Regions:
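Bacterial N-terminal signal peptides that target proteins for export
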Residues: 1-10
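C-terminal accessory domains and tails appended to enzymatic cores
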Residues: 82, 220-302
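Active-site rim beta-loop-alpha module in soluble metabolic enzymes
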Residues: 170-178, 182-227, 231-232
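Bacterial N-terminal signal peptides
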Residues: 9-19
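Active-site glycine-rich loop that binds ribose-phosphate moieties when present
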Residues: 148-174, 183-186
């Protein structure tokens, strides 16, 4: 077929303009990163995990570096927009001045969607950085679920879940898949057993609740960067973790008192001395209830 010169010129100009179009005019690739701290390389005790610990300030930097490595890997695979959730302790751990200016960060508590605040259906994939195993897992470093002091088990539709499972279910409500997790070997194995063949970046190997063999901070960042790039590249192969509804939430406390008092609520069923059951219409209603359970105190002040 012969193309008239004017039409040919118009076609060439159109293709040239398309090739140089700004990123905002092209398709976006949105990534959500939820960051915890117990699964950061080198973390083995409370000395690294909060302001009272003598190593905390250094390990805030290591946590920040691992999240930045995940961002770099995601961008190498084409990510154009990234939201980070600072989801450990007081939610004010990440050194935000070190982040690229186009990255946004969710900080502090409370939040209706807990460690996944800000997630919605516009995101393409989720990455977990610095995650740990569940409270029922005897293998993980600093293993717990939501509250190390108060909760003995959390179940969704009868399945005991780690925080990775809870947060994957929140993302799954919006049909967004989890594509990667970093942490110790127990956390990665537990998440992959629940969520399927997501990318796993193991940065330490657990010897017990307070001991591990660990990569150096630099080596852990290299591993996370590679895993994040692979995860975003494979995102189409990942399946969202979608729960059937209504969602049945079972929570077992270490003490009898919370279950006793919560059973006064008409929406709560006490299933044994230490356990309660709540049925939410979906995962969003369920996580909001769990956030209430783990955050409410009668003496709350601003």
């Amino acid at each position: 077929m012969r193309i008239a010169p004017r039409r040919l010129l118009a076609l060439v100009l159109f293709l040239a303009a398309s090739a140089t179009a700004p990123a905002s005019a092209q398709s976006k690739l949105k990534i959500y990163i939820s960051a915890d701290m117990e699964g950061i390389a080198g973390v083995v005790s409370g000395e690294q995990l909060g302001p009272s610990g003598f190593e905390y300030e250094r390990f805030r930097g290591f946590m920040t570096n691992e999240v930045l490595a995940a961002i770099e890997g995601a961008r190498a695979a084409g990510a154009t927009e990234i939201l980070v959730s600072d989801s450990h302790g007081n939610g004010q751990n990440l050194l935000i001045e070190r982040f690229p200016k186009d990255v946004q960060i969710v900080r502090s508590w409370p939040r209706p969607l807990a460690m996944m605040e800000g997630i919605d259906a516009s995101f393409d994939a989720v990455l977990f950085v610095g995650y740990h195993a569940s409270t029922v897992n005897p293998q993980g470093v600093r293993a717990h679920t939501m509250s190390s002091a108060n909760l003995a088990d959390v179940r969704l539709n009868g399945v005991s879940v780690p925080e990775a499972g809870l947060n994957a279910a929140i993302a799954g409500h919006y049909r967004v898949p989890v594509a990667m997790i970093s942490g110790d070997d127990a956390a990665v194995k537990e998440a992959q057993a629940l969520l399927g063949p997501i990318e796993g970046a193991i940065v330490k190997w657990s010897y017990g609740f307070h001991s591990a063999r660990t990569l150096t901070p630099e080596a852990s960042c290299d591993r996370i960067r590679e895993a994040a790039k692979a995860a975003v590249g494979r995102r189409a192969q990942m399946k969202p973790y979608v729960l059937t509804t209504p969602v049945t939430l079972d929570v077992r406390f270490k003490s009898y008192r919370p279950s006793e008092v919560l059973s006064y609520l008409p929406i709560v069923e006490r299933t044994d001395a230490h356990s309660i059951r709540f049925r939410g219409k979906d995962m969003i209603e369920t996580i909001r209830f769990l956030e209430f359970v783990t955050n409410y105190e009668p003496g709350l002040t601003p």
